[in-house]
Amino acid sequence: MLTIKDGTLLIHLLLFSVVALVQLQGAKSARAKNPSKMESKTGENQDRPVLLGGWEDRDPKDEEILELLPSILMKVNEQSNDEYHLMPIKLLKVSSQVVAGVKYKMDVQVARSQCKKSSNEKVDLTKCKKLEGHPEKVMTLEVWEKPWENFMRVEILGTKEV
């Protein structure tokens, strides 16, 4: 049995759906009339249109992304059973997408470090040295970050030896 509160919620949902459909139809017709108004041109790629909300290639040397790399690798290390921490060697490729926060897809060259996970100290991956005799790897990662919530989720999409 529906209560008045349930009925009110249902009416709001229906109204929201109708408004969303009307706006979607308006956006489709606006895009059909003038597709260039639906594109954004930013940064170095000003001659190439970028789809709003779509994946955008980023510069692997971008300071904002490089500052995130140690935190990202710490999350990767939490998921690994290896005795040693992995450390970043080089960010090879990165793209981003604005969602509720920012999603990054990246290829990161990593190596096993001399820093052991068993130590109780907080590890600074930028100060760890590479453990010789172990192959470097390229990890493909997807990172979802919402800094205002202090939230970061890292998913390992793939790993291959260099």
Swiss-Prot record:
Keyword tags: Disulfide bond, Protease inhibitor, Signal, Thiol protease inhibitor
Expression sites by tissue: Expressed in the cuticle of L3 and L4 larvae, female adult, and in the eggshell of developing microfilariae.
Region forming the signal peptide: 1-32
PROSITE patterns xrefs: CYSTATIN
Cysteines joined through disulfide linkages: 115-128
Keyword Signal in record: yes
CDD domains xref list: CY (cd00042)
Region (Disordered): 30-54
Gene Ontology terms for molecular function: cysteine-type endopeptidase inhibitor activity
Annotated site residues (Reactive site) in this chain: 53
Motif Secondary area of contact positions after renumbering to this chain: 97-101
Start-end of Basic and acidic residues biased regions: 36-47
Gene3D superfamilies: 3.10.450.10
SUPFAM superfamilies attached to this UniProt entry: Cystatin/monellin
Entry GO CC: cytoplasm; extracellular space; vesicle
Role played: Cysteine protease inhibitor which inhibits members of the peptidase C1 family. In the human host, inhibits CTSL/cathepsin L and CTSS/cathepsin S and to a lesser extent CTSB/cathepsin B which may cause defects in antigen processing and thereby impair antigen-driven T cell proliferation.
Family: Belongs to the cystatin family.
Protein name, per record: Onchocystatin
Species in which this protein is naturally found: Onchocerca volvulus
